[in-house]
C-alpha cells in the first residue's frame, strides 16, 4: 500500500536513512517524515547483498563498506558460541549448520536484499541478525508447509541455493521439479554448480565442468554424493525458496541450457543427449 500511495500522490525525494517510526503514525505522517528527513542520519550506510552470491562475497562486502576488517568479519561468521546463540533465537536454524563438513555455517541463511545501517561502525552481528530477521519474516509464511514437508528447512534452503545457481528465475520451478523427481527415485542431482562450490570455484572461473571436477571428492559435489549436498552453496532468493517448496508437477529428470540462457527440460536421457548434440551442432553449447 505504501508504494501505491507514493505513486498515486506522485511523492518524490524520499530520503533513504534509518528512522524512528511509531506504530501509531499514519501513512501521511510517515511519508512526511521520509520527505522532510526528520531524524535524517547522513552517516547511514547502504549494503546490497545479491542473491546467488556466497558467504565469502558477503564477508568481503561487509569488510569493504564498514569499519570491520575482513578477519574480524570472518571470525564472527565462524564463532561457534555465537552460532549456537543464533540457533536458539531463530526457529529455522538448527544444529545441521554445525556439521563439520560445511564450509560456512550461515551459507544460504542470510536473506539477500538491500539494508540500511546507522553508520560504518555497525557490528557484524547486527548485520547478520538483521538479515536473519528478514529470512525469518520470509520463511514464516511457509512455516506450516515446511513443517509438513519431508525435507528439513536446511534441506529446502540447500535445494533453493542450487536452483538459484542453475537457471533463470522463470525456470526455477521447472528446475526444482527435476531435482525433486531425482531425489524421489534416489538419482544423483548431478549439478555442476555444486561441484564448483565444493572446489571453491565459480562457473565464471572455469566454464563447463570438467570430468576431473565432477569426480572431485567433497561433500558438496552432487556427481558424487547420493542426494543433496551437505549444505547450501549460495544465498537463495525468495523465488528460489518458493520453487524449492512448491516445484512444478512434471516427470522431467533432465535439463540443459544453451549459450543464450534458454533452458530445455526432458523426461529421458536420450532426449537430453539429442538436444545437447543439436545445440553443439548449432554452436549454442560449449563442450
Predicted features and spans:
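Bacterial extracytoplasmic/cell-wall-associated proteins, especially those involved in peptidoglycan
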Residues: 48, 82-287
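Signal peptide-directed extracytoplasmic domains
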Residues: 1-134
Amino acid at each position: 500500500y505504501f508504494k501505491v500511495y507514493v505513486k498515486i500522490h506522485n511523492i518524490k525525494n524520499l530520503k533513504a536513512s534509518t528512522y524512528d517510526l511509531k506504530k501509531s503514525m499514519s501513512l501521511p505522517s510517515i511519508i512526511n517524515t521520509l520527505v522532510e528527513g526528520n531524524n535524517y542520519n547522513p552517516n547511514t550506510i547502504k549494503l546490497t547483498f545479491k542473491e546467488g552470491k556466497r558467504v565469502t562475497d558477503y564477508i568481503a562486502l561487509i569488510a569493504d563498506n564498514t569499519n570491520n576488517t575482513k578477519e574480524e568479519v570472518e571470525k564472527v561468521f565462524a564463532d561457534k558460541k555465537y552460532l549456537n546463540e543464533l540457533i536458539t533465537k531463530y526457529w529455522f536454524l538448527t544444529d545441521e549448520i554445525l556439521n563439520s563438513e560445511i564450509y560456512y555455517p550461515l551459507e544460504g541463511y542470510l536473506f539477500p536484499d538491500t539494508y540500511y545501517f546507522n553508520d560504518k561502525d555497525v557490528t557484524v552481528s547486527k548485520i547478520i541478525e538483521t538479515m536473519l530477521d528478514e529470512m525469518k519474516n520470509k520463511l514464516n509464511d511457509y512455516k506450516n508447509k515446511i513443517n509438513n514437508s519431508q525435507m528439513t528447512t536446511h534441506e529446502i534452503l540447500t535445494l533453493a541455493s542450487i536452483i538459484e545457481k542453475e537457471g533463470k528465475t522463470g525456470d526455477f520451478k521447472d528446475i526444482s521439479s527435476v531435482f525433486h523427481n531425482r531425489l524421489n527415485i534416489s538419482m544423483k542431482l548431478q549439478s555442476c554448480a555444486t561441484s564448483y562450490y565444493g572446489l571453491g570455484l565459480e562457473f565464471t572461473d572455469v566454464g563447463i565442468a570438467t570430468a576431473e571436477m565432477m569426480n572431485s571428492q567433497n561433500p558438496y559435489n552432487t556427481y558424487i554424493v547420493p542426494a543433496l549436498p551437505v549444505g547450501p552453496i549460495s544465498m537463495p532468493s525468495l523465488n528460489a525458496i518458493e520453487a524449492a517448496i512448491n516445484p512444478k508437477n512434471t516427470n522431467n529428470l533432465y535439463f540443459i541450457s544453451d549459450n543464450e540462457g534458454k533452458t530445455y527440460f526432458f523426461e529421458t536421457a536420450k532426449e537430453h543427449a539429442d538436444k545437447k548434440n543439436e545445440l553443439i551442432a548449432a554452436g549454442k553449447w560449449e563442450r
